Every structure is written in C-alpha cells, then in structure tokens.
Amino acid sequence: MKKIAFIILAVIALTASHPWQNKRVAYLGDSITDAKVLPNDTHYWGYLQEMLNTESYVYGISGRQWKHLLDQANKLKTEHGDEVDAIMIFMGTNDYNSGTPIGEWYTEATEVVNANGKMVERKRRDHVFDNTTFRGRINTVLDSLKKMYPTKQIVMLTPIHRGFAQFSEKNVQPSEEYCNSCGEYIDAYVNSIKEASAIWSVPVIDLYSLSGLMPSLPEQSMYVPRGNDFLHPNAEGHRRMALCIYYQLQALPCTF
C-alpha cells in the first residue's frame, strides 16, 4: 500500500504544472543576461525557456548597473505594455565593481502625528531615492516598477560569486577577494539586495548562496569561459544557474 501511494505521489509530482510554465517573462540585467555576451552559449533564461516553454523578453545590457534598470523597464513597457507575466532582475555585480557606495535605505525625522486622538511626536522614516548609492538606486527602481506593474510578479536574483577578469589592458577586474574602491566587498551588495526583498516585498533568489558557483576555484573551470574571464558563466554555468532558478520558482506564483 505504501509503495502504491509513493508511486501515485511521484506521478503527481511529474505531471504537476510548474507555476511558470508557458509564461511571458522579462529579464532585466547586465552582461550575464545580455544575449550578445558569449552569443554561442545558451544563457540561463534560454535554459528556462527550454524547461518551461516561456516567452523571453531579454533587455540585459553589458556593463549596466541598477541606475540603468529603468531604461530597460521603460523599453519593456513601450514594446510590450502590460503583456508580460513577470519581471526578473539580475543586477548588482557592476555596482560593486564600479565602487558604488552602499548608502542608506531611509532618512529619519521627528514629526507630529495623530495617534489615538492625541497629537504626539513620532519618528518617521522615508525611502532614500538617491541614484548615487546602491540602496538609493534599488529604492528608485523598485518603487517605479511597483507603480509601473502593480499586479505583476517581480523577482530579484543576487549576483553570483566573482572571479578575476581581464577584457583589455584598462579593463581589469580583481576577484571578489578584494574590496572595491569604496572599501566594500561584494557580499555587502548581495546582502543589500536580500534586504530590499523585505523592504519592498519582492522575492529574491539568492544565487550567491544557492547556485554553488565559485568561479575562482580552478576545480570549477568547467563553468567559466577559457582565457581571462572568470566573471561570466559559460553555457554549463548558465545551465546550473537555470536549474537553481527553476526549482526556486516552483515556490513562487508567476501570475496573481
């Protein structure tokens, strides 16, 4: 009897539809999302498209930071209007590399407010919308997207671990073992994205922790291109990311 029950559960699991099956998904991001970077390799969104039969609207552009995300979102809005089911944001590694200050989420001031019929002094906080800081940029983007797409699912992906990369004599990017020009390590940016998830009620998939990718390790060379690029995953690295995203998305509705 137990064996029969197990078989039934297995069949149900295999035939149950993934909540993101056949959906229209927009991807905003940087070079790891950009179809023009490593064009001969399948990207994570391409694997998700194969696994879920999704329609992909890809707007990622190499080198972009959080301050550029609204340009991509506005282009999505112009080209597709509201005809999109979900938006995925994969951004942050270039903010770290460029030395963007982390900044603050809020400003705080004391105001007089009516509480239970009495005018009392209370502290009040307001979001910082400052495009010169990382948290200010995230606040600006998520505030705008929540207003632009109030009924749509929005999901953030954290940056993955970074290895050394050299693309030219003047474009040399140290590995994540080094802090950036403002003294921050990459995990400060990863943690800020995770904090933003709670602040803005936007789900986050922590690829930094869950993907298993450590491009600085020689033993994981199968996940990165040959040469001096230990920053961008190759097709196998993207496949691993896609599998992680696929299973995390099982717990999230794509539409409401």
Which positions does each model-derived feature cover?
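Alpha-helical transmembrane segments and their juxtamembrane interfaces
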Residues: I12-A13, N40, G163, C244
